[in-house]
Amino acid sequence: MAAVQIDDYGPWTTEPAPRRETDLQALQARLFADVADFLGGRDGYAFAGRFDNMVGAATGIAPAAFERLQERIRNRYPVTVSVGIGTARTPADALDAAGTALRDAGSAQDENRQEALSHRSPPGFAGTPGAVTIAHFDVVDATGTYTDTVSPVRAGTEIQGAVTTLAEYLYDTHDAVTQFVGGDNAIAVCPEIDAGIVDDATAHVREAAGVDFQVGVGHGDTPHDAGADAKHALETCRATGARVHGPWTTADD
């Protein structure tokens, strides 16, 4: 997993005077697009996160390759980025290690930290990145239940609240990293999971937030491979009415 952080961004947004919010939003959107292109071009996944702090699923991408991303950002924007990369047994542990790598390089608002690039693993971990599992969550009938029925504010708070509930549950119980990816969709980078784990997660969200998810799960050597399988599995859910479909499902199910 990778953590991509804009260097000294908070002070930059206010010096020498506070910058226009729309300009900052446009900068963040363009910068994230470059991060997504970089990771996607190498079969990874990118998530906007908080925009000044982005997340990547980077299995199969050499840490040194991120120097190219840093060069691209430096040449195109008035800011730079630092990158922490973590390798661990689970996505949550890997992202925690990536965050540690960034913090060890200096504060997010340290004017002397620029384009840091560091790779970490948890103490005692000596393995290599394994296969990737992606779960793609989609709200059942979001258009009929929310988009065409309630105000945009209500639709947004209901869906994003459900994603937050899902993300906290999967992080706390299964060491997965879940991100909202727009519309009514969320993607979770998971340890290897089974249908029972997914059913428990969706049941928890249904009870806690009142939102019903359908889920496609994929498995592959890279985030792209696993994500593509997950999207195809999700289409099977939409076509059949199943709530969960994944690599454990037989062709006759």
Swiss-Prot record:
Gene3D superfamilies: 3.30.70.270, Nucleotide cyclase. Belongs to the archaeal-type GTP cyclohydrolase family. It holds the Pfam family GCH_III. GO terms for molecular function: GTP binding; GTP cyclohydrolase IIa activity. This is GTP cyclohydrolase III 2. Catalyzes the formation of 2-amino-5-formylamino-6-ribofuranosylamino-4(3H)-pyrimidinone ribonucleotide monophosphate and inorganic phosphate from GTP. Also has an independent pyrophosphate phosphohydrolase activity. The gene is gch32. Residues 102-125 are annotated as: Disordered. It catalyses: GTP + 3 H2O = 2-amino-5-formylamino-6-(5-phospho-D-ribosylamino)pyrimidin-4(3H)-one + 2 phosphate + 2 H(+). InterPro entries: GTP_CycHdrlase_3 (IPR007839), Nucleotide_cyclase (IPR029787), Rev_trsase/Diguanyl_cyclase (IPR043128). Its EC number is 3.5.4.29. The keyword DNA repair does not apply. One of its GO terms (biological process) is biosynthetic process. Keywords: GTP-binding, Hydrolase, Nucleotide-binding. It comes from the Archaea. HAMAP family: GTP_cyclohydro_3. The keyword Transmembrane does not apply.
